[in-house]
């Protein structure tokens, strides 16, 4: 059995990658070890950027129909001190603050619902073979592709499949990553975390004081800066909760109801439906590529469920890698394009880890160590009010970008990362923030499947130069003459080259740009 790409791991990232490839006329085989989707409610906090991916993959309506939480609940939550019913609380993690910079909105639904939607879409494409109940065993690389051995998870048959490329989307313990010898850098926190899934109507009633909120974080002096995170699964009393527990904790030797009720701040009825554990550690692969083998999602980077960074980052891995594999398939990729996958995605997660996840833990730890209402009430309340009046930096300053990418025409010495300030100015290496066009046209819908040149001044010579730089090489380019759209002041550039993943490859002056040089760099020549 052959395909253009073999994907090991049929979770959300693997299937999303397969869909993206299918939209670019590439066939894939997805090898998934489980027979059915795992019914654990994680990966729920989906960003507006992920909403753009859903729009690109053609699943927005299905995603919204699958969500068990009304859209009126929004994307924000509540942070509290000590427990969820504390007198000290404030609005927290409101991703709606930055929605104007995206062509979609936030979504919230359990990961298994997202997977169901993506699998249905995958089946519609006619280009994806999903092999459920099969496990990866080994891979051999040669000059023109890979040969992969798989076996049925429950024992029995084995098969050999081949393709030009293999992508491991097979989780934090990735067998694909291990098979090709990709090493990891691990930041251990030596904490055991418990994930509890449960039903409690009384909790619904207790938290009604906050109105329509779906997520809650109790910053407890007993937790050393680690989150006690509570998330609503639906409106039928189903919730999930995660928090640190003592080393050696098992399902049998620990009182999880007591832990939960302490975090809530009241006795509630609890019916547990799932109890699981994981080690709190942050892992980052040292490269995302070894020859013709790539890794994405948790196989490339894993961390505790802080802020929904995992699934959203994994989806962005898929968008980034898909267009580059498609460029190779189409014969227009430069020699260095595939290397740019690691060059772009690796520093983004390194920054996410250091500047958001670890920073959040350390800042919360410093707060609970420095302030306590029983020790100095005035000092505590002043510090708490400063937190409450902040700019929600976990949201407003989270801006993944590729300023330092070798395939972006940016400033010399720039560094890629995940921090920044949202805005509409077109910046090389940044996501294109869409603006409305006259006559209610949607700029996002006008962007081509390949590169798109936005000509904001109607410069015919510019258009001819870019056409000449792309057409002979078969590089897909859509040219949009937007001279009448009034976007020059908004974007701060006369022309913008947008990549297939809607990041900006170049922005600048129309008259003196080297179109051939820009295209060469953007395609990794």
Regions found by a protein language model. Name each.
Residues 234, 249-313, 333, 348, ...:
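FAD/FMN-dependent oxidoreductases across multiple families
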Residues 315-329:
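An active-site-proximal "capping" alpha-helix that borders the catalytic cofactor pocket
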Residues 124-136:
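A conserved beta-strand/loop element that lines the FAD pocket in flavoprotein oxidoreductases
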Residues 39-42, 46-121, 222-223:
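Active-site-adjacent segment of FAD-dependent monooxygenases/related oxidoreductases
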Residues 22-43:
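Glycine-rich FAD pyrophosphate-binding loop
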Residues 14-15:
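N-terminal Rossmann-fold NAD(P) dinucleotide-binding loop
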Residues 63, 120, 138, 145, ...:
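Conserved FAD-binding catalytic core of PHBH/FMO-like flavoproteins
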Residues 1-4, 8, 23-24, 33, ...:
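Helical substrate-recognition/capping region of FAD-dependent monooxygenase/halogenase enzymes
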